[in-house]
Each structure stands twice: as C-alpha cells, then as structure tokens.
Amino acid sequence: MAIERYFIKEGVREMLIDEYLEKELRRAGYGGIDIKKTPLGTKVIIFAANPGYVIGRGGRRIRELTRILERQFGLENPQIEVEEIKNPYLNAKVQAVRLAQALERGVHFRRAAYAAIRAIMRNGARGVEIRISGKLTGERAKSVRFYQGYLAKVGNPAETLVSKGYAQALLKLGVIGVKVSIMPPDAKLPDEIEVIEKPIQEEEVSEE
C-alpha cells in the first residue's frame, strides 16, 4: 500500500505541475512534461513549440520555473530541459490548448473544432478526435465529438501510439473541457488497415 500511495502522490503532483505549466506557458505552445528521478535530483523535460519563450531572456524564466518546481511543488533539485516540438499540429496537448484559447476568444466551438481537425489532418495525421464538453450553447451541458480518419481506441496501440491532450476554456457560461486525440503519421499498427477517406464527422455523445 505504501508503494501505491507513493505512485498516487507522484501522479497527482505531476498533474498539478502540468496544469500550472499549461497556464504559465500557453504562449510557448506548451505540449506537456516528462518527469524522471535521477541520482542527482529530478529531470524535467518541458515540450514546447517555442523553447525560447520557456527559457526567457538570459534564462530568467527557466530559473524562475526551477525555483517554483522546487519550492512550490517539492521537486528535489529539479533540472529543466526544454525540447522543441517539431510539428505542433501533431501534439495533442498543444492543439487542446490552442482550441481552448480559440473558445476563450469567442470562436464558435464547431468552427474551432473543424479548423483544428483540418489543420491536423493536413499535417499528416492518420486520425484525430476532438471532444468538447460543457455548456456550449445554453444552460444544458453536453459533449460533442468531432473525428476524422482512423484512431486506435483500445489496447496497447491506443496507449502507446495515440497522442492525447486536455485543456480547459473559461467562458461566461462556465468551464469547457477540450480533449484531443491524434494518431500520428508514423504510427505502426500490429495489423495495418486501409482507411477510406471520409469528411469530418460530428455527433453529440453522452458523458461517460
């Protein structure tokens, strides 16, 4: 049980760090983190479309982030590395954040989702799914799913091959959740299938 509690605690801490960095580094095209324990402390890799923004002028921002990770989140001797995201359109976290930003600017959720899917597919994705949930058009909360192409949904391919990202948009009607899943062009499936090109699909779904 002690080991289970440790992993739960570490998982919660990583989630809180991810949420904090998403807010602080939105302008950097924040795409997630990877935290690993090392003999010298804690290695933190920050994925971003604009690494220069994360580093800051003269390294000022990255030094401040290091202090916050150590003092506020309790990481032992954090060593931050910044890795550039070569194609932000294939990073689900980046796309979820950008979609949330579009909603906060007042772009209609359907228009924002269709534009995102078209851009993602143009950049070579094999498939993409976007779920937008909350009070989208009125008082009743609902969830709308948009998708195109092929996306592994279960098993090992869904866990290892699909890029997944989540973000929130703060609107007058309340919080809107945005979940993006992307199957990248280089995903190798155990049983290769032929995907018939279809237009973007849309459906209202019940919350699970």
UniProtKB/Swiss-Prot annotation:
Give residue ranges for domain KH type-2. Answer: 17-86
Q: Is NADP a UniProt keyword of this protein?
A: no
A GO molecular function annotation here is: structural constituent of ribosome
Does this UniProt record's set of keywords contain Ribosomal protein? Answer: yes
Task: Determine the domain of life of the protein's source.
Answer: Archaea
Q: Which CDD domains match?
A: KH-II_30S_S3_arch
A GO CC annotation given for this chain: cytosolic small ribosomal subunit
Q: Name one GO biological process term.
A: translation
Instruction: Read off the SMART domains from this record.
Output: KH
Task: Name the UniProt key words of this record, in alphabetical order.
Answer: Ribonucleoprotein, Ribosomal protein, RNA-binding, rRNA-binding
* Gene3D superfamilies listed in its UniProt record: 3.30.300.20, Ribosomal protein S3, C-terminal domain (3.30.1140.32)
Matches recorded under Pfam families? KH_2, Ribosomal_S3_C
Q: How does it assemble?
A: Part of the 30S ribosomal subunit.
Q: Which family does it belong to?
A: Belongs to the universal ribosomal protein uS3 family.
Q: What is this protein called?
A: Small ribosomal subunit protein uS3
Lineage start: Archaea, Methanobacteriati, Methanobacteriota, Thermococci, Thermococcales
